């Protein structure tokens, strides 16, 4: 175990929201409508306290790793094994006797982990704060906000757990937690047929990618006999002769899983419909967390591509990743031009920017797998640029979605104020007015701060 005090606390980063999730769900169901529960914003303040604690622990971990604890050894990884989950015997490929293997629940911290951990914890906290004002002021959400905050916390737990996982099995399990919660959050207004349909569409489309991801992990296990990052990313271990054709297939399967999660062509169809969820859900799924999971998975492949004995063996896959990113970036940006729904414009913009990052990661992987002087310097530069844009985009798009939520919120109130005096026409206007239609938003700059 290494990493000091903050590493010991790191297990609470995914654990706190996971433990708070059933508390809010059960208490909210038992005491909904009670005055004291309403004062707690139907669980919103409890959720905010949990995410605030997570943010503080995350900042401590970042500080210890980069500046305080490690100092000049800030590039060291922190591997903290909390415990073994499954232990079983199996026959190895060699003539060795039965070998015991375990999937331990632990944390793995490097620069990629820290970057995404800060983005996820910081934006989840801000979106939670925004949700208290957004969700609790709308009468349609009365007495059911506890379900929103419970699913929100479980989603955050899944994202944070995936970011800190020290092996691909736990990464996959937390990955699936996010998939379940996205279904619950997108379909929060389940009484609307469009929302229920969008939730099912998102769930089934991303499951297609997840099946490929699971196959890829099985192939990876078959090659390395382990799913631990510390083993797979060990260049001395990777340098041992491996079946490059099988490895190529395994990494391709994993990339398809990332394509589904990050809404890239051709598994992009779920993202625009996911706007049926409340605006905080749009900010959470499409900016801060879920869509970045696919990018994180591809970035995690970097050490495999950089292994010396695999030089030139994986360039075709790197080129494919670059092409998929380029095609999706152009396609999504073109579609965004003809959208009138403010949230769909942001959704297609998100898809395009994520594709831009995929293109950068593909270039980084190509350089890492190349074999010429200075190729690793170019690979690290491309990787850093891609992750820097991921950071920028997550922050900017999270704020844009929350700003669009404020605009939509005020459009609803303005429309109601203009037409409440005419009871006869009110229903007619409500049936045809779309608060998300940008053609109704002319002159807002002079009316809103």
Regions found by a protein language model. Name each.
Residues 1-449:
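...captures the hydrophobic TM-helix bundle architecture rather than a specific catalytic motif
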């Amino acid at each position: 175990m290494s990493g000091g005090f903050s590493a010991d606390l790191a297990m609470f980063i995914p654990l706190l929201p996971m433990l708070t999730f059933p508390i809010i769900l059960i208490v909210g169901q038992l005491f909904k409508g009670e005055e004291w529960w309403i004062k707690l914003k139907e669980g919103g303040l409890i959720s905010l306290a949990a995410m605030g604690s997570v943010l503080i622990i995350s900042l401590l971990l970042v500080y210890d790793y980069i500046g305080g604890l490690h100092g000049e050894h800030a590039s060291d990884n922190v591997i903290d094994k909390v415990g073994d989950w499954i232990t079983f015997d199996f026959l190895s490929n060699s003539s060795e006797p039965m070998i015991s293997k375990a999937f331990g629940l632990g944390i793995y911290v490097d620069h990629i982990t820290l970057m995404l951990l800060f983005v996820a914890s910081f934006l989840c906290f801000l979106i939670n704060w925004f949700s208290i004002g957004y969700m609790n002021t709308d009468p349609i959400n009365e007495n059911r906000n506890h379900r929103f905050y419970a699913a929100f916390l479980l989603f955050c737990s899944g994202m944070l757990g995936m970011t800190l996982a020290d092996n691909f099995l736990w990464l996959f399990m937390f990955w699936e937690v996010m998939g379940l919660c996205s279904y619950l959050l997108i379909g929060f207004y389940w009484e609307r047929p469009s929302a229920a349909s969008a939730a099912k569409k998102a769930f089934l489309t991303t499951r297609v990618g997840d099946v490929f991801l699971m196959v890829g992990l099985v192939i990876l296990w078959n090659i390395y006999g382990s799913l631990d990052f510390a083993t797979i990313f060990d260049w001395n271990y990777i340098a041992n002769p491996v079946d490059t054709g099988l490895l190529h297939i395994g990494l391709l399967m994993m990339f398809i899983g990332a394509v589904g999660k990050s809404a890239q062509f051709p598994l992009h169809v779920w993202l625009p419909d996911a706007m049926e969820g409340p605006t905080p859900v749009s900010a959470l799924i499409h900016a801060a967390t879920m869509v970045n999971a696919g990018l994180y998975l591809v970035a995690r492949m970097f050490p495999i591509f950089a292994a010396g004995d695999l030089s030139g063996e994986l360039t075709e896959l790197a080129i494919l990743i670059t092409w998929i990113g380029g095609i999706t970036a152009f396609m999504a940006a073109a579609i965004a031009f003809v959208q009138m729904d403010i949230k769909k414009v942001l959704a297609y913009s998100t898809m395009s920017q994520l594709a831009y990052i995929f293109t950068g990661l593909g270039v980084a992987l190509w350089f890492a797998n190349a074999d010429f002087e200075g190729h690793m310097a170019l690979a690290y530069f491309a990787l850093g640029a891609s992750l820097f844009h991921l950071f920028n985009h997550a922050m900017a798009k999270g704020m844009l979605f929350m700003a669009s939520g404020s605009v939509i919120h005020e459009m609803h109130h303005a429309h109601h104020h203009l037409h409440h005096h005419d009871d006869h026409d009110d229903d007619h206007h409500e049936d045809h007015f779309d608060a998300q239609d940008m053609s109704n938003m002319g002159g807002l700059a002079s009316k809103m701060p």
